Amino acid sequence: MSVRTDLAVEAKEIYEEKNAGEIPGVELKEYRQGRIKVTEVNVLNEQGEKAMNKAIGNYITLEIPDINQYDTQYKEHISKILAKTLMPLLKIDDSMTALVVGLGNWNITPDALGPKVIEKIMITRHLKEYIPNEIDEGIRPVCGISPGVLGITGIETAEIIKAVSNKIKPDIILCIDALASRRLERVNRTIQIGNTGISPGAGVGNRRMELNEKTLGVPVIAIGVPTVVDAATVANDTIDMVLDEMIKVADKDKNFYNMLKSLDRDEKERMIKEVLNPYVGELMVTPKDVDTLMDSISKIISTGINIALQPALELEDINSYLN
């Protein structure tokens, strides 16, 4: 069964669940920045690409605890870590133009991350073009677009981005999109940054044309947050938690519960899907407070991008410009 996830860190976990030893062709690094866990997954060659089912390149994951307890200061702290992570991948100077693309359907809250980020990006390309003498020389030209989805526009997202890119000729493209996760605890708590581009809709079985350097002719940095999880995954995780509690309190049935717990996770999820599918179909689940979470996460990501693209400015200056 194909496990629905867009996260490289979860692809790593899937491999480790089924194989012993290190992942061939993959370099891993884990460390913490305060309360934030950072995982770097570098797919080095075709061997690693096959093992991980991920394109050759770098994937960096920030796992953030306490999603509902953010204050402004902590949001800015996360944004600065995101910016610090982005900067080595961007490799652009003051004169290079960046195109920021907010992927997703703005009418569906869990899929509206990209458009919400674009609303808060510091857009400067028009100022550099029309009033160059009135703005700081260190400000980089940045433009943004929310191309919508095929069902709204009737045009493939990649076709819109390709046409815009051909016209304005950016030096780098940043794509922001909502992702899918296989773990409940990562939904709306994880930010993935990668330099291999993105396949919109892949995590929910609705794969569109890929957005990467090969298709667009420009380096593409992808930034994503898992906002949904498969209903079968929720059921699977719930069963595991129930079994854990039963094992703790059971005396004579402990071995039976341990046997159930030891069943292959993917096999359990496949069986759950078979049971659920006739009743609910392909169901994806998101938290009930997703509106508030989207506002917080989009602000974190947009601020991180603004800091990374405008290193000559202080955060106060960026916020002043946006307000």
Swiss-Prot record:
- Catalytic activity annotation: Endopeptidase action with P4 Glu or Asp, P1 preferably Glu > Asp, P1' hydrophobic and P2' Ala
For this UniProt entry, the molecular function terms from Gene Ontology, in alphabetical order, are: metalloendopeptidase activity
The signal sequence is: none
| PTM annotation, UniProt | Autoproteolytically processed. The inactive tetrameric zymogen termed p46 autoprocesses to a smaller form termed p41, which is active only during spore germination.
Q: Which residues form the propeptide?
A: 1-6
Give yes or no: UniProt keyword Protease: yes
The record's keywords, sorted A to Z, are:
Hydrolase, Protease, Zymogen
Say if the entry is tagged with keyword Transmembrane helix. no
Superkingdom of this protein's organism: Bacteria
Kindly give the InterPro entries that the UniProt entry links to this protein. Pept_HybD-like_dom_sf, Peptidase_A25
Give the GO terms filed under biological process for this record.
Answer: proteolysis; spore germination
EC no. given is 3.4.24.78
Q: Which family does it belong to?
A: Belongs to the peptidase A25 family.
Q: What does this protein do?
A: Initiates the rapid degradation of small, acid-soluble proteins during spore germination.
Subunit description:
Homotetramer.
- The name of this protein is Germination protease
